[in-house]
């Protein structure tokens, strides 16, 4: 899928730190946005006992999924590149078009890596470089 992973399995991380998987929340954000987007697992765990790891945006953010070739919106359930409209960016750019791929569902959306040919980006790259240098 193009999503980066670490060399350490999540089960080992959970064992060492003693944190339940239901309490590990992934944050998706970028410097260009004022807002962050989080997994819904804590909310779903404490409301109905489920494990919903789909992303949810705050009410002032709209994420639109677009066909990579035409930049027209795709239907829910279809993969597209993600554009974010963040009303908290009142003093800068309102919208950004990422090269991230994702699929929207009724319950949120999942990230599926980067578009073909897109440069790898993100904080995890620095972590990967440090880990590789110290391996």
Regions found by a protein language model. Name each.
Residues 1-135:
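Active-site glycine/GP-rich loop and adjacent strand/helix microenvironment
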């Amino acid at each position: 899928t193009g999503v980066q992973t670490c060399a350490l399995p999540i089960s080992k991380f959970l064992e060492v730190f003693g944190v339940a998987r239901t309490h590990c929340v992934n944050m998706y954000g970028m410097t260009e946005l004022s807002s962050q987007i989080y997994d819904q697992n804590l909310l779903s765990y404490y409301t109905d006992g489920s494990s919903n790891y789909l992303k949810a945006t705050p009410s002032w953010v709209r994420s639109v999924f677009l066909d990579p070739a035409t930049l027209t919106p795709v239907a829910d359930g279809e993969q597209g590149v993600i554009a974010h409209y963040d009303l908290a960016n009142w003093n800068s750019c309102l919208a950004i078009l990422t090269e991230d791929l994702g699929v929207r569902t009724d319950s949120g959306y999942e990230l599926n890596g980067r578009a073909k040919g897109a440069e790898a980006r993100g904080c995890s790259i620095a972590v990967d470089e440090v880990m590789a240098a110290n391996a």
